């Protein structure tokens, strides 16, 4: 597993790029955001011990957000499922944290989806008239 230094203001990856690495913050902090219609939407501010970019290990899709260093950062770079597996085996506390965080992210995504479905469901319902 490699380590990289990213200076404050440096870009770790950009929305739309394709690569397969995820990152663990060893020091510093990182902002994750995306841009739609020239509006920047912050998704998260990450600090030491946090991770980001993990979807790239499991999906061959372009990045959906940009990651930018807020402070000077040292990042561990995990570039394969095998590296991740080894890292998780060697860091059981991080493994438990990762499972909790991924479960929280999935729960938040589900809540947003349910909210949007409820918001729009009335627009598409067809009610059969009663006799």
Language-model features: locations:
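Cyclic-nucleotide recognition modules
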Residues: 11, 44-98
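Regulatory nucleotide-sensing modules
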Residues: 1-33
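Short, electropositive, low-hydrophobicity segments enriched in small/polar residues
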Residues: 13, 20, 32, 53, ...
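Solvent-exposed strand-loop boundary residues in beta-sheet-rich modules
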Residues: 36-38
């Amino acid at each position: 597993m490699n380590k990289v230094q990213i200076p404050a203001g440096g870009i770790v990856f950009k929305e739309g790029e394709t690569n397969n690495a995820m990152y663990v913050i060893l020091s510093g902090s990182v902002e994750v955001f995306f841009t739609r219609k020239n509006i920047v939407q912050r998704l998260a501010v990450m600090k030491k011990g946090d991770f980001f970019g993990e979807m790239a290990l499991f999906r061959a899709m372009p990045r959906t957000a940009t990651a930018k260093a807020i402070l000077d950062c040292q990042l561990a770079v995990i570039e394969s499922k095998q590296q991740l597996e080894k890292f998780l085996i060697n860091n059981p506390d991080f493994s438990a944290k990762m499972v909790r965080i991924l479960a929280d992210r999935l729960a938040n995504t589900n809540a947003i989806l349910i909210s949007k479905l409820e918001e729009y469901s009335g627009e598409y319902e067809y009610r059969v008239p009663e006799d």
